[in-house]
Amino acid sequence: MSQVSVTINGRQFRMACEDGQEGYLMNLAHEIDNRINGLRSKSGRISDIGLIVMLAITLADELAEARQRI
């Protein structure tokens, strides 16, 4: 197992992943960070939990749409 340090919403998190998956995990974290920053810029003042909920709903919607296309 490897350990990776990622930054999301200005906070650092240490996460475990399989050996060789470090770059993949870092790319996922970067995508999440970009999306949170985008939501923040569109939503103005919103709490961290509000951002997380908005992102979770957005991702769930994207997943549902992808499943319908299959």
Which ranges hold each PLM region?
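An amphipathic alpha-helical micro-motif enriched in hydrophobic residues
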Residues: 52-62
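Amphipathic, hydrophobic secondary-structure cores in small proteins
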Residues: 5-6, 12-13, 42-54
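Basic helix-turn-helix/winged-helix DNA-binding cores
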Residues: 1-29
